[in-house]
Each structure stands twice: as C-alpha cells, then as structure tokens.
C-alpha cells in the first residue's frame, strides 16, 4: 500500500511560440515522487487541463488525481505523472481541430491543430522532461481527451506514434450532428481517417445517452480500425458506456479503464452483460447489442464480436457483431457465451418500428434569461416568447439523451431537487416534454 501523498503543481502563464498565447499546465506528481528520487515515471498528457483535477464554472472535474491515487494504492497501476494542458478562452475548437478538406465544409477556419500539436511536442514535453523525472519514448507516453479533445488526441496519435504510444479517444467529436430548423437530423463527418496501423494502443469510447454524439460513430470507427489491422482486446479497446452522458462526470467515471489499459493490469473478466433495445422490428431501424465485459480490476470493454445462440432462430438471427436480423414477430431469448461467462436477454420482435420519432420539448426559463439566449435541452430549442422555448425534432428511434438544460456553452441550469441531477429521455415513441429552469449556475 502506498502511504505517501501525491502532489499537484500549477505552472501558470506557460508561453507558446507556436500559438502566440499562454496557458496553465497542471501537473500531478505521484505519491513516491519526492521520496524515491531515483525513480522515473511514464507521463499521461491530457487536454482541457483546467478540468482534469478541478471543476470551474464551465464544467466539472475528472478528479484524475483521485482515480490515479486509488489505482496505485490498490496495486493495479504503476505510478505516473499526469499533465493537464488548459485551454485558452475562445480558442478551444480552433486549437483542437487539425485542418483537412472536410473540416472546411463544416466549420470556419482557422484551424490550429497542427500548431497545437507542435506546441505539445516541441514546447510542453521538453519542459516536462527537463523539469521532472520522466521516462522517455512512446511506450511510456500517452494522451487522453474527450469530445473535441478526443479528435485532437486521435489526430496526434496517428500523426505521431513515434511520440505517443497510447491514446484514449473518449466521446470523440467526429461528426457534427444537429437538427435543422425543420427538425431534420443533419450529420456531417469531418474527421480525417488515416487508414494505417501504427504501433499504438488505442482506447475508444462513447456513452449510450450522449444524444447526437451517437454510439454508432465510435462503433463504426472501431470497425474501420479493425480493417486497418487493429485487434480488439489487444491494441484496440472499445467501450460503449450504457446510459452515460456527454459530461466530465461520465468521463471521470470511466477514466480508470484506459489508465489500467495503458499503465496497469486489466485483470480477468468476471461478468458479461447484454445492453441494447429489447425490441426490434422486422421493418425499421437496425438494432445492435452492446455486450459489456467487466473485469476484476474494474476495467470494462465492449465485445466487438461474439458467439450468440438464439433460442428460436425462426424469429431472429444474430450476427457476430451483435446486429439483430428479425424475421417474424414474436419473442425469443438470446445467449452470449465467452469462456465460462454467460449473458442472456429477451428480445421481442414486432412487425415494424419507426425509423424516426417526433420529440417536442418546451422549456420555461427564469425572467433573468436574456431573450437572445440560445437554449439547449438535448438539442437547440427555439424561442417562442414570454420566457418559453419550444421545438420539435425527428429523433432516431431508441436514441437516448441525458443532460442539463443549458444556456449557450457551459452555463447550465441549477436543479433544486436533489433527486433530479440531470434530465433524460429515450426516443422510443412520440413524446412531448416540459422542463422548467429554476435558475442558472453562476
């Protein structure tokens, strides 16, 4: 057991020649760092550094120091140094987006991703290596980021596998998906694929209730990576986190998994569970199961291919990737076996499910809310007058949303009821929802 304490250091106003700005770096030094002065440590670099160890008015904390301390004290992970690289106000997307032709079709330039990459490799890393006792080389160097931080991690990892040997791409912003004024879903993929198989350990995930940050974007990229030569369960780990939202608290909740994958021992599988819709249509949207394996270390992953047994194959066939192929209405039980572990699930087949479900949302806001405010409740809700916002969208069947009503970017509702931490809904049938915002977080 480690009895010493880890320490935190802030390097304020760290300058960048490449980006012509300054920012803070937040450095976690592991428990033995100041006592064992001969020891050197692997390093994890993280984006959105202001949220890596603490919360602010724009978002919650990942509490990475807490997770790392716990895994080290349990003997599950080696001690590491963690470097949180803060964002610069109003420059986040600019710095996190590498330039490519697709990007210009979705966002307005400039895109400074290449310069941000150079800033990390040529300015931040030399400083960290000179200041702290680090292990050098890609086998000892990892990167982690979420959302837009996920896409910049993906790009840097594939562009510079000679520097970073492990990358955690969490809830990546690969596709700009939004509902237009008519409520129709528009999807614009804007990330660049590399089609290569570098010497890289890759963690890829997405939550099951992130709304338009859909599970399918992570799953589809994982399937492409397999075609590129990556091996699931070896140099590629996919996790589709059931019920998880697009938020710091959810990323914090699963950050232990990539830490174990990169720097520790994932342990042995102890259970498997089948997640996903229990209803599928002979006609309608394709449904796919999410088999989640849990390990004795707390590590988790989604099994990309398995051996399924269908009790009544006249009703349903099931592909190895968990895709349901309904044949005729009825109910049947499916079973997945992985070694000694078994999971089963009842599936009901109906004649038809709608591809899209109409969801109408009305939001009442406090009088202090500016009329010009942009309100989001899973998707953008238009102003309709007298402190009310109302809008409809045609949402893909089964898509789940978990969120707080927000005003613009980063300003969320303050929920007085301690039993209600976040709002949530799943588009299983036509619905009309009403939310009242009591107040906004300061």
Residue ranges and their predicted role:
Residues 1, 76, 268, 276, ...:
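Insoluble glucan recognition modules
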Residues 1-275, 286-290, 296, 354-373, ...:
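Non-catalytic cap/lid and distal C-terminal segments of serine-dependent acyl enzymes
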Residues 17-19, 296, 311, 337-341, ...:
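Short strand-coil-strand connectors
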Residues 25-26, 48, 295, 299-305, ...:
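Bimodal feature
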Residues 37-41, 295-320:
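Short flexible loop/turn segments that cap and initiate beta-strands
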Residues 194, 202-205, 284, 302-310, ...:
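Acidic, low-complexity Ser/Thr/Gly/Pro-rich repeat segments typical of extracellular/periplasmic
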């Amino acid at each position: 057991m480690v009895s010493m304490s880890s320490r935190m250091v802030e390097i304020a106003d760290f300058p960048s020649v490449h980006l012509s700005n300054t920012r803070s770096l937040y450095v976690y030094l592991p428990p033995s760092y100041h006592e064992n002065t001969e020891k050197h440590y692997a390093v994890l670099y993280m984006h959105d550094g202001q949220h890596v160890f603490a919360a602010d008015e724009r978002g919650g904390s990942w509490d990475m120091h807490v997770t790392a301390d716990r895994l080290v004290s349990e003997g599950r992970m080696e001690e590491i140094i963690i470097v949180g690289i803060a964002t610069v106000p109003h420059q986040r997307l600019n710095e996190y987006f590498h330039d490519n032709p697709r990007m210009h079709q979705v966002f307005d330039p400039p895109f400074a991703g290449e310069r941000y990459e150079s800033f990390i490799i040529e300015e931040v890393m030399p400083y960290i290596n000179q200041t702290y006792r680090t292990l050098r080389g890609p086998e000892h160097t990892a990167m982690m980021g979420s959302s837009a931080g996920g896409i910049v991690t993906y790009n840097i990892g594939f562009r510079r596998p000679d520097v970073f040997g492990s990358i955690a791409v969490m809830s990546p912003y690969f596709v700009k998906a939004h509902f237009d004024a008519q409520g129709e879903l528009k999807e614009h993929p804007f990330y660049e694929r590399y089609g290569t198989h570098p010497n890289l350990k890759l963690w890829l995930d997405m939550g099951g209730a992130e709304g338009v940050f859909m599970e399918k974007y992570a799953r589809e990229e994982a399937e492409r990576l397999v075609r590129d030569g990556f091996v699931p369960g070896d140099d590629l780990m996919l996790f589709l986190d059931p019920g998880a939202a697009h938020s710091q608290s959810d990323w914090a909740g699963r950050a232990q998994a990539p830490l174990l994958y990169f720097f520790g021992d994932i342990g042995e599988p102890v259970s498997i569970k089948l997640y996903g819709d229990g209803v599928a249509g002979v006609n309608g949207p394709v449904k796919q199961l999410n088999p989640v394996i849990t390990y004795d270390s707390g590590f988790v992953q989604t099994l990309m291919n398995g051996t399924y047994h269908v009790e009544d194959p006249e009703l349903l066939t099931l592909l190895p990737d968990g895709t349901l192929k309904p044949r005729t209405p009825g109910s049947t039980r499916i079973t997945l076996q992985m070694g000694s572990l078994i999971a089963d699930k009842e599936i009901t087949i109906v004649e038809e499910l709608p591809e899209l479900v109409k969801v109408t949302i009305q939001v009442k806001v406090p009088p202090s809310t500016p009329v010009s405010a942009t309100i989001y409740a899973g998707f953008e809700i238009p102003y309709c007058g007298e402190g009310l916002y109302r809008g409809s969208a045609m949402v893909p069947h089964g898509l789940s949303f978990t969120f707080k009503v927000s005003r613009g970017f980063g300003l969320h509702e303050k929920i007085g009821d301690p039993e209600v931490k976040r709002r949530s809904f799943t588009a299983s049938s036509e619905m009309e929802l009403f939310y009242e915002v009591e107040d906004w977080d300061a």
